[in-house]
Amino acid sequence: MSLLLVIFLLELVVQLVNTIGAKTINNLLWRFYLSIPGSPLAKDFAEQRAKQKEYLQVRHDLNATSSQDEFAKWARLQRKHDKLMDELEKKKSQLDAHRTSFSRKLTIYRWILTRGMQWFLCFWFSSQPMFWLPYGWFPYWVEWLVSFPNAPMGSVSIVVWQSACSGVLALVIEAVMAVVRYTGGTGMQKQRQPVPAAGGAPGTSKKDL
């Protein structure tokens, strides 16, 4: 794979991450991780869901039981309710701790694979031309500018190519998002268009009394 394409794909990933949002990506990956049957936390998450369901049922039964008419049953349900609440709070604290660690690791990996890779490629290939400009088509200052900082004169450097890809992709993604927002807003307006109330026959009007 050519370096030109690698830089373009890397910038595309960076722009998509910026558009979607790092927090949203972390949440989606966390849910996906919990849904994997063999993952270490899948069992804990399933237990938490089961306890939540049991807790809601006990709370429903507790609310439906009178503490005066059925005190023994009410006291038993209250003890079970408190026990399940404590267990859920402990389980939630454990999962929250795992989630924080998971998000921290994702942030580190994402930085290495995006920003870190950007800096590394710019440093490692700073003197390598991405492609050459047609000879004699551009003035000296343009050739010097596009070859900044260390590429041969008359060529396009990796820094300039990276900046160009980033700028073009940002504009394209912004245009696509604007079209999506406009299309969605138009559809909502059509759905909310008021329906005229049933009145008299067409061509008739009410007369003032």
Swiss-Prot record:
An example molecular function term from Gene Ontology annotations: protein-membrane adaptor activity
Region annotation Disordered: where it falls in the sequence: 188-209
Keywords for the protein's UniProt record, in alphabetical order: Coiled coil, Endoplasmic reticulum, Membrane, Transmembrane, Transmembrane helix, Transport
Regions that span the bilayer: 4-23, 111-131, 156-172
Residue ranges annotated as Cytoplasmic topological domain: 24-110, 173-209
One Pfam short name: CHD5
Keyword Hydrolase: no
InterPro entries given in the database record: Get1, Get1_fungi, Helix_hairpin_bin_sf
Keyword Endoplasmic reticulum listed: yes
Disulphide bond pairs: none
Mode of membrane association: Multi-pass membrane protein
Subcellular location: Endoplasmic reticulum membrane
Coiled coil stretches, renumbered: 74-101
Side of membrane Lumenal, spans: 1-3, 132-155
One GO term (biological process): tail-anchored membrane protein insertion into ER membrane
GO cellular component: endoplasmic reticulum membrane; GET complex
Subunit structure as annotated in this protein's UniProt entry: Interacts with GET3.
Function of the molecule: Required for the post-translational delivery of tail-anchored (TA) proteins to the endoplasmic reticulum. Acts as a membrane receptor for soluble GET3, which recognizes and selectively binds the transmembrane domain of TA proteins in the cytosol.
UniProt similarity note: Belongs to the WRB/GET1 family.
Name the UniProt record assigns to this protein: Protein GET1
Species in which this protein is naturally found: Chaetomium thermophilum (strain DSM 1495 / CBS 144.50 / IMI 039719) (Thermochaetoides thermophila)
Name of the gene encoding the protein in the UniProt record: GET1
